[in-house]
Every structure is written in C-alpha cells, then in structure tokens.
Design a protein with these regions (language model features):
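Extracytoplasmic soluble-region selector
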Residues: 26-128, 207
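C-terminal motif of bacterial Sec signal peptides marking the signal peptidase cleavage site
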Residues: 21-24
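Beta-propeller blade signature
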Residues: 180-189, 232-246, 288-301, 305-311, ...
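Blade-loop segments of beta-propeller domains
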Residues: 184-225, 418-421
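Loop/turn-rich, solvent-exposed surfaces of beta-rich toroidal or solenoidal domains
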Residues: 349-403
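Surface-exposed loop and turn segments in beta-propeller and other repeat-based domains
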Residues: 136-150, 194-200, 245-265, 304-354, ...
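Beta-strand-rich domains and repeat architectures in extracellular enzymes and scaffolds
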Residues: 146-179
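Structural signature of eukaryotic scaffold interfaces centered on beta-propeller domains
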Residues: 153-165, 203-216, 263-279, 354-364, ...
Length: 457
C-alpha cells in the first residue's frame, strides 16, 4: 500500500516570543518598535521530501495590523534556523523541507535575537488518503492475514504483534485464572505451539515484540492491580523481558528491564526499533497521555529506587495470599529523561477520538496508529475506528471506520465468526509493519469458542 499525504494540521496562532526591537532605518527614518513575532502554528506536520512555506506575523505595540510577513522580501532580515537540519531544514525565506522521520524545532528571529519565535516540526512517512480509503472498503477475503485461530484458553486475545518473517504473537487473558496473561507465538492460521505465563502484570491491552538476533523481548505493562471483580488492570510500570516459553512456570509482577514514569499508571508500550522510538500511553479518568522517548535513551537510563502506587495482588490460591501494599522497586525512571514529545487526548476527544473503548496503538515512522471500537452487545453492531496522529497529537489521517466488519453475513461465510454469535467481532490490537497495517479482531466461533483474527491492509 503506497502512502500519500492527505493534509497538514494547522493549529491556532500562538505567541512564541516577545521583546522590543527597533528596526534598522535610514538616518531620516523613524525607528519602528516591534513587540512580538508569532508563528502561524505551534506545531507543523509534513511528509518526507515535502516542502511547505512557514508563515509568521510581526506585531507592533498599539497597531491593529494583522497581515502575514513578506518572507520573500524579508524587509526585517529575519533569520531562520533548524534545531536538527537532518530532520527538517529551513531556508532564508522560511521554506521548510522534511528530510527524515522525527521531530525538531524551527526558530525565527530578528537579526539581533531581540525578538524570536519557535515552532515544533514533525516529519512523517506520508501515510494519508490511501490508508483511509483502504480501511473504509467492505470485507474481502484477501484482507485476511490469519483467521479463526484458537489460542491457549477460551478467552479473547487482547493484542498481537508480527515478526519480520510473519510469525504472529498474541496476548491472551487467563479466563478462570484472571491473574494470568499468556504470551503466545505461532504461524498465521495455526494455534500457537508455545507460550509463557505472566502473573499479576495487568490487562495486556497493548504489547510489542522486539527482535534481537535469535532472541525475542516482550514489552508489556507490568505490576498490575487487582480490581474488585478479581481481574487485573492499572499497570504501574512497563517491562521488557526475554521470551522464555515454559508451560509450568509463571513470571510474577514484572521482569527483565522495568520502566517507570512518576504519576502515570494504566501504562502500555509500543516500540519502533528502526527509528529508535518507545511510546508509552497512560490513562486516568477522562484523559489518555502518549509520551515518546528514544528507545536507546530509555534502555540507558540507570536503575534507581522508585515507589509504585498502592496495589493489590494475589489471593487466587492458598500459596499466594492477597496483599495490598505500596512497594519500592528498582526500575529505569523515565521521569529523569526528556521525552521527544507528548500529547494528551480527552475521552472522548477531538473529532470523537476515543469515543469507544481503547483497543491498542502502534508507532511507526513518526506516526501513531490509534485503535478503538466496541463489539455487538455494547452497540447494535460491532464497530471499529482507526486514527493516525503525529507525535504532537496532530491528526494526519482522520478517524476512519473499518468497513470490513459491517457485513456480518460475509464474515460468517468467510469463517471469521459463527452465525450464532450475533455478529460479535471486537477490535483487539493494531500494528504497522513493513508498510502494511494489521488490525486484530476477537470473534466467537461455534459453541462460543473464542477466535483470534488479523486483517492486513
């Protein structure tokens, strides 16, 4: 699927710097006082190799003039600069060009630096109109990457990932053992052959698999909290742990490298190893945060003692009595390093973003893929949406309804769900891999069997 740019978000005017400036003049001219310099937007998004014209205004005290500055003539000799020209460069007339995936700051200033302004620029890979059109299309059997896979327990998958060679990974709830999460690995269209069990980690809404030679590392929310119904959620930390399949051993609470962000919980990770990006989402009532870090910076952060929120866990068997405690552990404290960017959305947010249940996210090439939806039962019919944003939260591809799950009869005929399931198909997991978008769905087969399905766009 070839990606093309659809639009660039422009936000309201913002003041980025103020000062007083007396313009250069001939001997017989009055000096002219400049009060402030303003960019058109505090955030600009553009695609690789795209060139756009940046616009600014100069404001004079007491003046009502409200026109764009003539960047071509440049009568005040404004100076333009980029914090990282390898990501985005800007010429003497304010023309901006994207060169590499990432984010940097563009500065515009008077020649003596007495007045200046900045705007943050994000360069992405150009995903746009073609993706929205693909997602809107009706069901076609060619969309199915893997269908009707029964996992280890008769519960729905929560998320999935895909290796470079096409191997599928799943994260599944423990069913009658609500303290467990299963991490499973298998070929498309086949039940997984091996798995490992995680105990008291959380709900597993999102996870990621990191490939390192022959080894695989799982990024997942950890140090979960037991809710009143016995289920687990509200992960306090994110862990990166080596995949070690063992059907007789459980890993408790966390493992491997564990990462902490002060005052953030309900945390889930996504990674883009090619571009050295770690993104962590955290949620509280009414809001969801997305925070971006250099993956290498996160791994290099030294271990320190951190105190978690009070958590309850255990009590599922006689050997593990229930505990409620405030624990101090050693972790990589990401609060100590500067993020690359972040944004927060309300629930529901702009353009109805996050109107439905959050079903996962992924990051790739400077973009964040946001997945939401609900199954038939909560809604008259199953529904799912994908929205693509940049690392500043600007919408790059508008919220698009997934058309492939609208025709229940077609899904039944294709063996995705059964005729006695009332059209149950629930969005579960999203990944952008190898220039293709993969979205997951949990369905019910005959006899209420739970199936995992993955579509590819």
């Amino acid at each position: 699927m070839k990606h093309t740019t659809i639009f660039r978000s422009i936000l309201p005017l913002c003041i980025a710097g103020t000062a007083l400036f007396f313009a250069a003049c001939e001997d017989n001219e009055e000096t002219e006082e400049i009060g402030s310099l303003l960019f058109e937007s505090k955030n600009v998004t553009l695609a690789l190799d795209e060139t756009v014209q940046l616009r600014v205004r100069l404001y004079r005290p007491g003046s009502t003039e409200n026109t764009w500055y003539d960047t071509t003539a440049n009568p005040y000799n404004l100076q333009w600069s980029s914090g990282d020209p390898s990501i985005a460069s800007v010429d003497a007339q304010g023309r901006l060009t994207g060169h590499a995936i990432g984010s940097t700051v563009i500065r515009c200033a008077m020649s003596d630096n007495s007045v200046h302004a900045t705007t943050r620029v994000t360069v992405h890979d150009g995903t746009g109109e073609s993706l929205a059109a693909e997602l809107s299309r009706p069901f076609d059997d060619a969309l199915v990457y893997s269908r009707s896979v029964y996992l280890q327990r008769n519960t729905i998958m929560q998320s999935f990932d895909i290796e470079t060679d096409g191997t599928l990974w799943y994260l599944q709830l423990g069913g009658n053992d609500p303290e467990l999460l299963y991490v499973l690995r298998g070929a498309p269209n086949e039940s997984p052959k091996d798995y490992m069990m995680l105990r008291w980690f959380g709900h597993g809404t999102n996870f990621a698999v990191e490939e390192q030679g022959a080894e695989r590392y799982i990024w997942i929310g950890s140090n979960g909290n037991k809710l009143s119904d016995g289920s687990y959620s509200q992960s306090n930390t994110v862990s990166r742990l080596k995949y070690s399949p063992d059907k007789n051993r459980k890993l408790d609470l966390c493992g491997g490298d564990t990462f902490f962000i002060k005052d953030k919980w309900n945390v889930h990770p996504a990674i883009d190893t090619d571009n050295d990006i770690l993104c962590i989402t955290a949620s509280t009532t009414g809001v969801r945060d997305f925070i971006f870090y250099r993956l290498s910076d996160a791994l290099a952060t030294p271990l320190s003692k951190v105190t978690l929120r009070t958590q309850t866990y255990g009590g599922e068997d006689a050997d593990s009595p229930q505990k409620t405690e405030t624990r101090t552990i050693e972790a990589h404290d990401l609060t100590s390093i500067a993020p690359l960017g972040s944004f927060t959305i309300s629930v529901p947010g702009k353009d109805n973003l996050s109107q439905y249940d959050f079903q996962g996210f992924d990051v790739q090439d400077g973009l964040l893929y946001f997945y939401e939806g609900e199954a038939a039962g909560k809604q008259p019919k199953s529904i799912a949406f994908v929205t693509v944003l940049d690392i500043s939260g600007n919408i790059v591809v508008p919220r698009t309804q997934v058309g492939a799950i609208n025709d229940v009869n077609a899904l039944v005929e294709a063996g995705i769900c059964s005729s006695d399931s009332n059209g149950y198909i629930e969005a579960e997991g999203i990944k952008m891999k190898h220039d293709r978008l993969y979205i997951g769905f949990a369905t019910h087969g005959p006899g209420a069997k739970r199936w995992a399905n993955v579509f590819r766009y």
